[in-house]
Amino acid sequence: MKFLELADLDTVNNALSFDADDCRIRGKCELYTTKSTNSDKKLFKAIENRCQEDLFALSSSKSPEYAFSLTQQSPFGPLDQSSSRRTFMYIVATLNASYPDHDFSSLQPTDFYKEPSLSRVVDSVNSTLNNIGRGRLSVNGIWEIIDRHINLSDCSVYSYTPDSDSDPYGDDALIWGMSYFFFNKNMKRMLYLSLHGLGKEVSGRNRYGNDDDSVFTPLADDAEPSDFDDDWVANMDD
């Protein structure tokens, strides 16, 4: 995956990292193309081999329950289809790129969830930002910038909710977290959006997983009103 360094997304990244009343918020908004790096190719080969082994076991299995679980219950679609496996690989590669000190290659497709509606995801992020005192950002800037780069209405959205042992912030007094992947197949782009609430004593981390105490620059309070109003949210899944 190739990380796209864009000034407006950097602004969103900065705005999503701040101190709330009872915790520190560490957010990410990162855009990647699906162009494979050498490490991605190794990862894809390993995942593909694992999936092929599962498919071989399926062909040898007489259990209809096992057959159903492999071909129907993946959030990415039937895993006997290469397009489904490829989407899963892109998401794992995105996590590896975003957190290079962690290895997510052992994740399974069932560790993820396909969100049924874009509006529900937007509402969830907006509600979280409202609750922690950054509600204006969600309406006046974030979604407009994201949509500009990935065309939200054309995206499939997946979520990842790991346990504390698997979460990259699990050792950092993690209180809560949310992670979403917006995949636009036609544009060959993946956007990773996450918010994590950490205990007050924990320092921030930059996108490379290192300590980062830099001061964030929030989106301006007097920014132009966004087109992404309540009506837009209500109709985005049409």
Curated annotation (Swiss-Prot):
Biased composition (Acidic residues): 221-238
Gene3D superfamilies assigned: Repressor of RNA polymerase III transcription Maf1
Alphabetic keyword roster: Cytoplasm, Nucleus, Repressor, Transcription, Transcription regulation
GO BP field: negative regulation of transcription by RNA polymerase III
Region annotation (Disordered) ranges: 215-238
Signal sequence segment: none
Name this protein carries in UniProt: Repressor of RNA polymerase III transcription maf1
Family per similarity comment: Belongs to the MAF1 family.
Principal location listed in the UniProt entry: cytoplasm
Source organism (scientific name): Schizosaccharomyces pombe (strain 972 / ATCC 24843) (Fission yeast)
Quaternary structure (record): Interacts with TFIIIB subunit brf1 and RNA polymerase III subunit rpc82.
GO cellular component: cytoplasm; nucleus
Keyword Transcription regulation: yes
Functional note: Mediator of diverse signals that repress RNA polymerase III transcription. Inhibits the de novo assembly of TFIIIB onto DNA.
GO terms assigned for molecular function: DNA-binding transcription repressor activity, RNA polymerase III-specific; RNA polymerase III core binding
Top-level taxon in the UniProt lineage: Eukaryota
Compartments reported by the entry: Cytoplasm; Nucleus
